[in-house]
Structures are given as structure tokens and as C-alpha cells.
């Protein structure tokens, strides 16, 4: 090898990678979020950290490091039970809210861990997608719905005029459920029969959770999944950023809205 060629390659090896800091932070973000972030969310988090960088550069750097999100959205089957209608579809697919606690959504989804069936029932705020409260049970019963409501009411005691939207599941038709929300001056709204898009906020969360947690990891027991779910919901509320929330997590977005 000619001496000039040798020194040329040696100089290139010694040259500082101008994207070294960016690469370190990209790897840090990717692993912190357990590989759940693609290049767009990584870009938003990089900007939160003070980097001035566009998504194409982040995508190129991730490709050069062979980093790629393995998460893919999947369809899920929610638990419906018997259906009926006792409330109008007030929301009517208008999932926008200008402030917290104007519109909430709830639903129940079935989760299979081995031979055990679990049922997750959360309440989401349509303003920022935050999980207000939730209950996970081995049976889709009224007690889990009441517990979910009680936890939400412990967090917020003034909910006059709030709209709580659900599908036409039997739980939401029950007198006990209706009485509890009426006592807090909450307005009940129900999807049309068999129309999943009418409750897209809740269905979207279930799809994300199942993609990023249930199908991304292995659980040897229902208890292991429940523990992981508790950690995931805390992560989802406090750390997982969304493009529609201007690169903020649900809690960050709510906090900033209240400051402003």
C-alpha cells in the first residue's frame, strides 16, 4: 500500500465523527424507550433535548447504526358483551377538546396471558390521551368499572359537564354506572352499535399498548403482565411523546396547558 494511501485512511480513522453526540443521544433515546420509537419520535425527543436536527438526518443516522423500531400497530379485539343503547352519541367522533376534563373515553379490552383472560378498563382524557384511571381484572364485571370510576373521582372532584363516552357495552347500561356518573354531573355518551370508529380514542390506545407491550414481550404469568402494565401506563402518561401533542407526553402537555 502506498504511504499516501495509508496516511489518508489513518487520518480518516482519527477524524472526529461530527454526528457523534447525535448518535449517542439517538441510541440513548432508542434504548430508553425499549425500541418503541421510530425516527420521527426520536427526532422529536432529540429536539426536546436541544438538538437542531431534522427527521431525515435522524433516519439516516439510525440506518447507519442499524437501529429500527420493531413495533408495528396491530388490530385488537375489544370485549363487548351484550350491547344496547340508553344514551345518544354526543361525541359523534369529535375527539377534540380544548382543555382537560371536558371529554373522557372508556372501553374494555380482553388480554390473553397463556390460558388466563384479563380485562383492562381505562378512562382516557380526549384532550391529551392521558390515562386518568384504570382497572385490570380476571372478569369483566361491574366492580372493575366502579373501581375505575372511583379512582378517577379521587383525582378530580369537580367534573360538572364532562362528557364520558363509551360503546354500548352492558356495563355502561347498568343503573349503578349511570347513577355514579350522574352524581358527579357527568353527561353520558354512547357509540352507535357495532361502530368501532365512534370510540377511536380508546381503541387506538389498546392497539398501541398491545403492540408496544403485550406482543413485544413475553409474560410467564398474569401477575407479570399486570406489573408490566402498571409500569407501561406510567411510561405512557409521563414519558411517551406524541406528535399531536407537539412532541410532549400527555402529562407534560397537560401541565404546559395549565401554565399557559
List PLM regions with ranges:
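Mobile genetic element proteins and their domesticated derivatives, centered on retroelements
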Residues: 6, 26, 42, 58, ...
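Active-site beta-loop-alpha junctions of metal-dependent nucleic acid enzymes
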Residues: 116, 135-157
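Short small-residue beta-strand/loop micro-motif enriched in glycine and branched aliphatics
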Residues: 8, 130-134, 188-191, 215-216
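Basic, flexible linker segments flanking DNA-binding modules
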Residues: 4-99, 195, 251-257
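C-terminal domain-tail junction helix/linker
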Residues: 182-186, 208-260
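An active-site-proximal beta-strand-loop segment
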Residues: 97-132, 138-140
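Generic alpha-helical secondary structure signal
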Residues: 1-5, 21, 144, 148, ...
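RNase H-like two-metal-ion nuclease catalytic core shared by retroviral integrases
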Residues: 80-82, 166-168, 174-175, 190-210, ...
